[in-house]
C-alpha cells in the first residue's frame, strides 16, 4: 500500500506507556461481540505502529519516509483489506446494500487516513469507527450520518467544469478532497512553490488529467454542498432535478466514484482539508471537537459560536488556495462566502462577524427564492440553513455585480461559496428522503442564481467551476442502537470521548 508523500509531519501521538493497560481494557470492551453491531473497528498507534482492530481480526502497519506503508502483523481478518474506491458507486447499488457490514464495506486510502490522524499531537488514543448501521440519535446523532472512513460516509461528489477543463462527463474514477486545492491552483495557473507544491503542506495532487492546459480561466467559482451523498446528487442530475449542477457536469467532468474525504469525515476538518490541501492531522483542525492535552481543555470548532475563530487552531504555516492565488497575483481579489476556513481571503463572511459587523440576516425563510416551504415550516434546521444559504447567495451576487453593502469589489480571481442546507436535510431526513431531495433542488437553484449573475457580468466564458461536498452521508438503521461509552463506564475505564469517536485515556 502506498500513500502520496506529505509535507513535513509533526511528531504525532501514540499511546503512552502509562495508558497501555487502560487501552487494553478499553479495546477488550470495544471489540467484544456485544458491541460488534455498532463498532466497525478501532484505530490506534502504539509502538510506532498503526493498528486497526476489529472483533474478528487486526492489522498493524508502518509508514516509511517516502509515505509507503508495509503491513507488519495480521491476526485473523484485516479490517482494512478492502480499500477500493468504486464500491457502492451509483444510487441503485447503494440502495441495494444499505447498512453494509464491515466485512462487505470498503475503506478507501485507509492506511494513509489512519497515519495522518495520528500525525497530530492532539490525536486521540483510540479512534472508534462507527458501523454503517449505527444509529446514535440517542447520543445526539441523526438518521443520516458520517464520520467513518466507510466508503459511503467518506464519498463526496466532485465536479470540475468550464474553461480549462476537459469535457468528459461522468467518469468512473475517484479523487480525494485534498486534491481540490492543488487542482484549483493548477487550473488557475498559480505558480508552484520552490518544492513544486502549490501550498505549504500539500497532501493532495493536482488532477491534471482532467484539465486542458491550452485554456486558462480568469476566475474559478467553487461551491460546497455540505454533507451531500454523491450518488443522490448525480442521480438527481441525470433525472433533471438538479439542472444547474447537471449543466456544470456537461461543461466538464464529474468523478463518478466520488472524492474521498479525510478521517474523520466531518465538517470542519474537511472544509479545511479542501481549502488547504492538507489532511486534518496536518492542518490542525482535527475534528468538530477534540481534547487538547497541552491545555487540558476541550476544543470545539464546528458551532455557530466558534466558526468565526475556528482557524485560530490551524497548524502554523498552513496555506490556502487564497494564499496560492496571492503568491502568484499579489493584487488579485479572492472571496470566501459562509466559510469558516477563510485564511488568506480578501472578503470573508466570518471576518464581518469577527469585526462585529454582521451582514443582514433575514428573519425567516418564508417567501425566499429557492426555498421549499414544505420543510422550512416543520424543520428548524431546514429553516435556519435556508436563511444562511440565502444570505450567502446575496453576498455572492453582490460581489459578482461589483458592489455589496455599498462597497465596490472587483471580480474575484477565486470565489468560494459554502452551502449548508444539504447537510441539515440529509442528517434529519436521511440522504434518500424527500427532504434531502428538496435540499438538493434548493441548493441547485442557488447555484443557478450565481451562474446567471456571472452571465450578466459577462465573465461566464472566462470561468471555471468546482463543486464538492465535505463528506458523504449514509442512512443509518434506526433499529441498530447502542452506546459504547456505557460499556466503558460500567467497566471503570477512564476515558474522555470527544465527538463520539475520539477516546482520550486518563483525561
Predicted regions mapped to residue ranges:
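Polar, surface-exposed loop/tail segments
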Residues: 44-49, 190-218
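A short beta-strand-to-alpha-helix junction
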Residues: 11-25, 167-182, 194-201, 263, ...
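Loop/turn elements at helix/coil->beta-strand transitions in domains of secreted/extracellular proteins
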Residues: 37, 122-124, 216-221, 251-255, ...
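Active-site nucleophile/metal-coordination loop of metallo-enzymes that catalyze phosphate/sulfate
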Residues: 1-9, 208-212, 230-324, 340-348
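Active-site His/acidic residue clusters
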Residues: 340-358, 362-368, 376-377, 399-445, ...
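Structural recognition of the beta-strand scaffold that forms the well-ordered cores
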Residues: 127, 159-160, 220-224, 247, ...
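Metal-dependent active-site segment of extracytoplasmic phospho-/sulfohydrolases and closely related
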Residues: 1, 37-46, 50-53, 124-129, ...
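Active-site neighborhoods of enzymes that stabilize oxyanions during catalysis
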Residues: 2-166, 317-318, 498-507
Amino acid at each position: 500500500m502506498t500513500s502520496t508523500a506529505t509535507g513535513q509531519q509533526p511528531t504525532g501521538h501514540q499511546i503512552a506507556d502509562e495508558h497501555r493497560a487502560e487501552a487494553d481494557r478499553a479495546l477488550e470492551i470495544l471489540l467484544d461481540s456485544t458491541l460488534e453491531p455498532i463498532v466497525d473497528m478501532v484505530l490506534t498507534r502504539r509502538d510506532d505502529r498503526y493498528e486497526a482492530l476489529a472483533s474478528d481480526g487486526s492489522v498493524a502497519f508502518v509508514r516509511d519516509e517516502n509515505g509507503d506503508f508495509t503491513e507488519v502483523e495480521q491476526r485473523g481478518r484485516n479490517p482494512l483489506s478492502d480499500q477500493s474506491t468504486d464500491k457502492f458507486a451509483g444510487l441503485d447499488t447503494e440502495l441495494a446494500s444499505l447498512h453494509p457490514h464491515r466485512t462487505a464495506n470498503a475503506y478507501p486510502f485507509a492506511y494513509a487516513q489512519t497515519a495522518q490522524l495520528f500525525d497530530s499531537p492532539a490525536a486521540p488514543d483510540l479512534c472508534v469507527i462507527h458501523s454503517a448501521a449505527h444509529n446514535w440519535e440517542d447520543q445526539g446523532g441523526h438518521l443520516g450520518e458520517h464520520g467513518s472512513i466507510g466508503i459511503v460516509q467518506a464519498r463526496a461528489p466532485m465536479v470540475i467544469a468550464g474553461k480549462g477543463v476537459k469535457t468528459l462527463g461522468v467518469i468512473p474514477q475517484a479523487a480525494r478532497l485534498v486534491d481540490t486545492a492543488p487542482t484549483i491552483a493548477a487550473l488557475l495557473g498559480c505558480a508552484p512553490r520552490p518544492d513544486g507544491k502549490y501550498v505549504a503542506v500539500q497532501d493532495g495532487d493536482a488532477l491534471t488529467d482532467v484539465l486542458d492546459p491550452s485554456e486558462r480561466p480568469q476566475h474559478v467559482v467553487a461551491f460546497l454542498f455540505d454533507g451531500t451523498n454523491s450518488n443522490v446528487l448525480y442521480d438527481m442530475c441525470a433525472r433533471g432535478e438538479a439542472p444547474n449542477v447537471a449543466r456544470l457536469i456537461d461543461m466538464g467532468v464529474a468523478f463518478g466514484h466520488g472524492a474521498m474525504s479525510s478521517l474523520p469525515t466531518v465538517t470542519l476538518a474537511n472544509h479545511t482539508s479542501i481549502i488547504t490541501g492538507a489532511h486534518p492531522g496536518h492542518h490542525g483542525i482535527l475534528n468538530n471537537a477534540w481534547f487538547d492535552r497541552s491545555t487540558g481543555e476541550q476544543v470545539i470548532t464546528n458551532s455557530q459560536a466558534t466558526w468565526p475563530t475556528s482557524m485560530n487552531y490551524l497548524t502554523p504555516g498552513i496555506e490556502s488556495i487564497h494564499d496560492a492565488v496571492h503568491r502568484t497575483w499579489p493584487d488579485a481579489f479572492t472571496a470566501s462566502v459562509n466559510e469558516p476556513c477563510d485564511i488568506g481571503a480578501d472578503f470573508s463572511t466570518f471576518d464581518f462577524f469577527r469585526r462585529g459587523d454582521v451582514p443582514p440576516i433575514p428573519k425567516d425563510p418564508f417567501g425566499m427564492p429557492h426555498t421549499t416551504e414544505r420543510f422550512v415550516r416543520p424543520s428548524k434546521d431546514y429553516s435556519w440553513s435556508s436563511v444562511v444559504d440565502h444570505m450567502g447567495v446575496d453576498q455572492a451576487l453582490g460581489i459578482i455585480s461589483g458592489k455589496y453593502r455599498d462597497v465596490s469589489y472587483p471580480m474575484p480571481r477565486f470565489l468560494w461559496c459554502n452551502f449548508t442546507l444539504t447537510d441539515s436535510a440529509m442528517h434529519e431526513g436521511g440522504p434518500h428522503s424527500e427532504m434531502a431531495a428538496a435540499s438538493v433542488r434548493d441548493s441547485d437553484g442557488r447555484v443557478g442564481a450565481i451562474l446567471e449573475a456571472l452571465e450578466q457580468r459577462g465573465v461566464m466564458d472566462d470561468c471555471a467551476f468546482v463543486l464538492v461536498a465535505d463528506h458523504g452521508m449514509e442512512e443509518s438503521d434506526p433499529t441498530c442502537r447502542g452506546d459504547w461509552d456505557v460499556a466503558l463506564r460500567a467497566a471503570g475505564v477512564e476515558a474522555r470521548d470527544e465527538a463520539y469517536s475520539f477516546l482520550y485515556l486518563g483525561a
